[in-house]
Amino acid sequence: MEQIRLLLLLTIRVLSGSAQFNGYNCDANLHSRFPAERDISVYCGVQAITMKINFCTVLFSGYSETDLALNGRHGDSHCRGFINNNTFPAVVIFIINLSTLEGCGNNLVVSTIPGVSAYGNATSVQIGNISGYIDTPDPPTIISYLPGLLYKFSCSYPLEYLVNNTQLASSSAAISVRENNGTFVSTLNLLLYNDSTYNQQLIIPSIGLPLKTKVFAAVQATNLDGRWNVLMDYCYTTPSGNPNDDIRYDLFLSCDKDPQTTVIENGRSQRGRFSFEVFRFVKHKNQKMSTVFLHCVTKLCRADDCPFLMPICSHRERRDAGRRTTWSSQSSSGSAVLSAGPIITRSDETPTNNSQLGSPSVPPFQLNAITSALISGMVILGVMSFSLLVCPLALLHRKGPTSLVLNGIRNPVFD
């Protein structure tokens, strides 16, 4: 009788839990609780901010998906989420497009981060922080027995990316150069192009560039006479728009150069040019797309003195270095950090494709079941044939020496 009562209680509990979750992909044993901080996931993507909220705990708290809205905009259907019941647990998804990030009252705060480049130049980057919340409406009564739900989120991006995330942003820098007869100011720009003609600027599709796509970069100067050239000291990449990011990958620095990077022109004219193949940062391994920002530390140098400011890499240049004359402090200007990006790259989802991108495209040799069986049969047949050939030879070899040592009676006829 006690067992029947226990079974009846368990059945009632399961039925009540199923009724409470209304057939959604929830577990009454796991999700019969109020929401916690772990019930929201925030993804700061390259084109949108995505929030996923555990819908099961929302149901347990007595609310539905229509009760959740961005920043208290419960009367605006565009500020609500939608349910995805194909996951466990079921979730409510909110998506904020970066192109319309302030549509539902999200807050954008701009701050400036100071920094110092490798050459000691002071740099600053403007960062845009997007923040907001998702909540339930206040009840019309004085008291309520339902808990109020509140989920907060925040994402940070380079400001130039938020201004127009559909196009590449490029920074410029003004360099002041002092001469004997005065001072002039030249403006430098870092631009990205599709091909080696440098006619059409780089256009990135919404799905991103495939890995190993070749991108052509150019540093150009304006308001510059023929006595001065552009010299790129070094160029590197970061996953964010901050040139001082702790994660960086050098494309070329002094005599060291990335194997996929080609310096086309540097220090020989009023434009520096190079190309490189796009990649993804490993820190973006859980994302379908990766962001790459390009930075170049650049200066102006006198056309006659630029070769002397280039790094000495070959043995001949080292031998001839002693013949070089000294130059004055007016031979070059101060350095400036130029940035461009983001370059959005997409990663193939299959590991095989990723590994093939970094190796020669030689199709791997694979054995199917039939081929393996044929090879195995040929090996067995060869072993048996070899055994049949070796055994008689071994017997003959064993009998031969024995017959040679046989002794008989001497025949007198041969005397």
From Swiss-Prot:
Q: Where is the composition biased (Polar residues)?
A: 350-359
Q: Which GO terms describe its cellular component?
A: cytoplasmic vesicle membrane; extracellular region
Q: Where is the ZP domain?
A: 43-320
Q: Which residues lie on this side of the membrane: Extracellular?
A: 20-372
Return the Gene3D superfamilies for the record: Zona pellucida, ZP-C domain
| Segments in the Cytoplasmic topological domain | 394-415
Query: Which residues are reported to be glycosylated?
Result: 164
- Please report the PTM annotation for this entry: Proteolytically cleaved before the transmembrane segment to yield the secreted form found in the extracellular matrix of the cupula.
- What are the residue positions of the site described as Cleavage? 319-320
In this chain, composition skew of type Low complexity spans 328-339
Query: Which residues form each disulfide bond in the chain?
Result: 44-155, 79-104, 235-296, 255-313
Q: Which UniProt keywords apply?
A: Cytoplasmic vesicle, Disulfide bond, Extracellular matrix, Glycoprotein, Membrane, Secreted, Signal, Transmembrane, Transmembrane helix
Q: Where is this region: Disordered?
A: 323-359
- Report the InterPro entries cross-referenced here: ZP-C, ZP-C_dom, ZP-N, ZP_dom
Q: Which domain of life does the UniProt lineage start with?
A: Eukaryota
Signal peptide position in this chain? 1-19
Transmembrane stretches in the record are 373-393
- Pfam families linked to this entry: Zona_pellucida, ZP-N
The entry's function note states: Glycoprotein which is a component of the gelatinous extracellular matrix in the cupulae of the vestibular organ.
What protein am I looking at? Zona pellucida-like domain-containing protein 1
Query: Which species is listed as the source?
Result: Macaca fascicularis
> Which taxonomic lineage does the organism of this UniProt entry have?
Eukaryota, Metazoa, Chordata, Craniata, Vertebrata
Name the gene that codes for it.
ZPLD1
